Curated annotation (Swiss-Prot):
InterPro entries: Deoxy-glucuronate_isom_IolB, IolB_Bacilli, KduI/IolB_isomerase, RmlC-like_jellyroll, RmlC_Cupin_sf
Summary of the function given for this chain in its UniProt record: Involved in the isomerization of 5-deoxy-glucuronate (5DG) to 5-dehydro-2-deoxy-D-gluconate (DKG or 2-deoxy-5-keto-D-gluconate).
EC number: 5.3.1.30
Organism annotation: Bacillus subtilis (strain 168)
Name of the protein in its database record: 5-deoxy-glucuronate isomerase
One Gene Ontology MF term: 5-deoxy-D-glucuronate isomerase activity
Transmembrane segments: none
Superkingdom of the organism of origin: Bacteria
Pathway listed: Polyol metabolism; myo-inositol degradation into acetyl-CoA; acetyl-CoA from myo-inositol: step 4/7
Catalysed reaction equations from the record: 5-deoxy-D-glucuronate = 5-dehydro-2-deoxy-D-gluconate
Family the entry assigns: Belongs to the isomerase IolB family.
Top-level EC class as recorded in UniProt: isomerase
Amino acid sequence: MSYLLRKPQSHEVSNGVKLVHEVTTSNSDLTYVEFKVLDLASGSSYTEELKKQEICIVAVTGKITVTDHESTFENIGTRESVFERKPTDSVYISNDRAFEITAVSDARVALCYSPSEKQLPTKLIKAEDNGIEHRGQFSNKRTVHNILPDSDPSANSLLVVEVYTDSGNWSSYPPHKHDQDNLPEESFLEETYYHELDPGQGFVFQRVYTDDRSIDETMTVGNENVVIVPAGYHPVGVPDGYTSYYLNVMAGPTRKWKFYNDPAHEWILER
């Protein structure tokens, strides 16, 4: 199995709380992005104290209450399945604060982390405030829910987005990268992909590769898998009959998403 691919686990961290994924700077090649997925049984709680990190808590499915002990957001979350294809609620919390998540119903929660030293206000990112985009043409169509885009000044370094790609389409395509700190041409952003498939027995293909091929990994990615993108191009292909969802987390030295297309495939945009 590729070192960039993580499969789900089910490790109980406390009563009613299971850890599904944990990507950290110590167990991956990432420096800026960390990521967790938790399953919370109804009535259970998870607490954590942030140090020099900010977090975006995404209510992937189910309903939760989130508090940093100054602000409390009750009964947030909008869907039982990501394939209802409607935006969800999220909460941004800045560094050096503690938070608690309580499950109002059975819930899956994504915790998206990046470095931060400047405190910013805690914020509820309402589902209706997610910017929705329809990108691409031909067989490269996808729908994007912008949870925490670079146009939103609510965070110091964190970017968070959900993407839906229909049967037979490609996403993050033509292949693009953002691994050079060379603005205005390109920004350096690490990235993680948390994938779900409908139906759940499906899979997608994702390739991560650099110009010099020091990274060149092509992966068969199953439901609830995570792909780590420390650098390089990272397209996703969705087979016929299945729908793809993924949650992206990005962060780097500058909070700007400026990508560079693979010149070998950029002609696709000129059709």
